[in-house]
C-alpha cells in the first residue's frame, strides 16, 4: 500500500499545479492518471497547439506548458502513478483510501480530484470512419506532418478554429466546413481565421470521402445546393467529445451532470475529498486553465487544514523565503 498526505487524481494542468502546491506546503503527494503521460487533454489532444489564455504567457505551446508544470513540481518529488486508474474510494480510520487498477491501494490524508472532463471519446464523422488512421484524425499531435497537404477541418467550435490557425501556415490549403451559420468558437479566433487564407464554408456537410487506402478528396454539400469536390489529404474532425466520469461517478460524489459540486473551499460532499479544474461546478464557474490553477491552490490549502487543523490556511507567498 502506498501512503501520502495528498493524492491528486488527474495529471492535467490543475493536477500538476496541485502537486507543486502540495509540495510547497511540505506535503507528500502522489498523482494518479489513467493516461500514460502527464498533461491530460493537452498532451493527448493538442501538445503543439498554442495556448493564449494562461497568465504570464502571450502564447505557450501545450507541451511546453506541461513540461514547465512538471519541472515546477519536480523539486518536491511527487510520485506519479501514470497509466493507472483510480477505481474506488473508501475510508480507513477516517482517511481516504483509493483503490487503483491492478488491486493496489493508495492511502492518503486527503484527495484532490482534477480529472478534467473525465475520459473522452471523439464524436465521429460518419462518412469518414473507414479512413481513421489513413486520412482522418481527431487531433494533430504533430502539425508539421501536414506540411504541404490539403486539409479539411470539420466543426465550428474552438478546436476547429484553433486547428485552422495552427495548420494554415503549414498546409497547402485549409478548408473549414461547418453545418451551421453560427460558430461556437471564440469570436476573436473566428475573426483571426477569417483574416487568413482559409476557406470557410457554412451550412454545409461532408457527404463523401474519396480514396482507396488513403483520403484523396472530399465532397461537401451546402444546404440546398449541389455537392462540390475538392482535393483533401487529411480530414481533421473537430466535432467535440463525449465525456465519461468513469469510476468517479460511483464514489458517492454530488454531481451536477458530469461535474463535481464543490463549495468555496473546493470541498466536495465527501470528507477530505476536494476537487479543482474543469471537473468542478459552482455558481459562476468558468472553465479555463487559469482558473484551474487558483482552484488547485485553494483545494490544497484547505486539504492541508483538514490534515492538520492547527495549520494556517494561507502558508505565505512562495517568494517570502527569497
Indicate residue ranges for each PLM-predicted region.
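N-terminal Rossmann-like FAD-binding beta1-loop-alpha1 element of flavoenzymes
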Residues: 4-30, 163-165
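Residue-level detector of alpha-helix initiation sites
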Residues: 12-14, 37, 119, 158-159, ...
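Glycine-rich FAD pyrophosphate-binding loop
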Residues: 23-44, 174-184
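Conserved N-terminal glycine-rich FAD pyrophosphate-binding loop of Rossmann-like flavoproteins
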Residues: 36-60, 186-190, 194
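A Rossmann-like FAD-binding core segment of flavoenzymes
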Residues: 67-100, 105-108, 168-264, 307, ...
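FAD-site-proximal beta/loop scaffold in flavoenzymes
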Residues: 124, 129-147, 234-290, 294, ...
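Rossmann-like NAD(P)H-binding beta-loop-alpha module
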Residues: 149-170
